[in-house]
Amino acid sequence: MKQAPRPALALRPLAAGDEGELLRIHRAPEVVRWWDEPEEGFPWSDEPEATRLTIEVDGRVAGLIQFYEEPMPRYRHASIDLFLDPRLHGRGLGTEAVRRLVRHLIDDRGHHRITIDPSASNAAAIRVYEKAGFRRVGVMRRYEREIGGEGWRDGVLMELLAGEES
């Protein structure tokens, strides 16, 4: 039996036409529980220190991946984050998007360390990052506020060093 062809994944700069689909994906319960509720408009365009890319799968907007670069040259590290349309979860697309961005940050931008900090209770995201080569460094206790709540949740600090990419 033939295996279905793997979907074509691309990372590209955000475009104004991405707004509606990214907001729809971002508001999905599986996404918004880990990300702040978006305000009106296109909330990802007003943070100049972050670089955001649209994740496309088979030519369609499928999510967002972003990175923040440490501005001090002696550190040369970046942190990343992403969300993906829940309808595409479980297909390896998040892992592939992370791998591609990591390669770009190491090969093209000269970073030697990439970090990510998922919620400690977001087991699916942690698995994605581990498949991409990230290792757990430690738990950051009471790291971020619960979305829509008064409590705190722990975060997991994960890192990948140049040469460790999978």
Question: Where are the regions that the model predicts?
Answer:
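Conserved N-terminal entry element of GNAT/NAT acetyltransferase domains
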Residues: M1-G20, V156, L160-S166
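Conserved GNAT acetyl-CoA-binding A-motif
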Residues: D107-D117
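Conserved catalytic-core motifs of GNAT/GCN5-like acyltransferases
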Residues: T115-P118, R135-G151
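Acetyl-CoA-dependent GNAT
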Residues: P13, P29-H89, T95, H104, ...
